[in-house]
Amino acid sequence: ECDNKKLPRQFSSASYYTGPLIDAHLHMPFTFDVPKALYAQADYDGAVLEKDVAAGSIMCVFDKTGVQSAIGFYVIPSLLKGQAVVQIKQIEEKFPGRITPFIMPAHVSALNIQPADVESVLKANPGLFKGFGEIGLYKDAYKGTSPDDVSLLPFYEIANKYGLVVMMHPDYGQEKAIEKIVKEYPDVTFLFHGDQLHPLVLKTDFLGRYPNAYLSVDDIFLDIQNEGQSSSLYGDKSKEEFVSKFKRDY
């Protein structure tokens, strides 16, 4: 049973936003069972929806925290695409509009969905999926793959054809390739994520020059000292000290 009583106000700032929230980066539990040994190649171990995590419990957290909806990245492996989509459709039917489904590659080379697979899923489920990604180019399955690599271009073409958003987490040193694809595909909306792009986004007018380019800002607030790659807002504070000061000052 869901206790969806709203959480009390956490911060001290007089200017306090109380409107709806959208989670722009939600990795959904798997909608299929996969041998753990196989997914060890992806260097992450995912929960299974309705087995380890109930969809209703996700919605309960949304209701408690004022999250209206979320962009949900659903892993769809090439060999299990039919099975994977079944539960995605069920969630959309049961909780319409709460999760905006994106088709996410498996980030395991042998299971990564191919352009023809993506198109077949889109044709079989018209209007269900709104984006493609997250594409994690820093992951081993994509290591050394540039955003403008010939292997990725068909996905951008499909995004253009079906009106999909492309969500990408690039690797370091890929700024020029990022600018190239954004420029060459002006009708495709690109949503980027990751501190790899901070120099380009925060120190240039990249977002101003390209209205089809967006950055999810949540990653700017990530990474507590000794628990991540950077310490942008946290500095040398402990987690507890940061939370206390953040509540006080914001």
Predicted ranges, named:
Residues P96, S146-Y250:
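Catalytic pocket-lining loop regions of alpha/beta-barrel enzymes
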Residues C2-K6, S78-L79, Q83-M167, L233-K237:
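Active-site gating/metal-coordination segments in enzymes
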Residues T18, V34-V48, F129, Y214-D236:
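Active-site gating loops and adjacent loop-to-helix segments of metal-dependent hydrolytic enzymes
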Residues S15-Y17, D63-G66, E93-F95, A124-G127, ...:
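Extracellular/periplasmic catalytic domains that process cell-envelope and extracellular macromolecules
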Residues H27, V75-I76, M104-V108, E134-Y138, ...:
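Active-site beta-loop-alpha junctions enriched in small/polar residues
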Residues K6-Q10, K51-M59, L80-Q90, I113-V121, ...:
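Alpha-helical scaffolding within the catalytic cores
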Residues E1-Q83:
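An N-terminally biased module of ancient metal coordination in phosphate/nucleic-acid-related enzymes
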Residues I22-L26, S69-G72, I99-M104, K130-E134, ...:
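Hydrophobic faces of well-ordered beta-strands that scaffold small-molecule active sites
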